[in-house]
Amino acid sequence: MEKPLVSVIMPVYNAEEYLEEAVDSVIASNYSPLELILVDDGSADRSYHLAQQLAEKADTGVIKVYKQPNAGPCVARNYAVSLAKGKYIFPLDADDRVGPDFFAEAVDVMEADNGVKVVYSHAEFFGERTGEWKLAPYSRSLLARKNMIPISAMYRRSDW
């Protein structure tokens, strides 16, 4: 059975320091098929050029790089979603990473139950801060008052 495409969308703004690590974490995934859509949001540093170099280095067509005038991460993220072809959308900020098993495990959960609308995992800090990022346990009432779901979570494209 053919596995569904996962579209990883990444807004990029002055993220030269972390971008390669974020992209490498996606490429190192044990899941296929993936597409990685990078939208540079008017970076003043070398982020856009680095993104282009990473796409060329991957040489698989999996990474697509776009540029827009600075409009903020939400606009860049939504633009990336408009370009995405995957059944599933996974936003990943340019200063974040994803584990190698996440996509396979998240797709399995979502394919097994159409009622599941979002899949996310525990998170850890890296860089200057270390340790576990303590997320509140999921509850509908808490979600209505305070979003405890991190941006790096998998959604059905049809629900975006």
Show which residues each predicted segment covers.
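Nucleotide-sugar donor-binding/catalytic module of glycosyltransferases
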Residues: 1-160
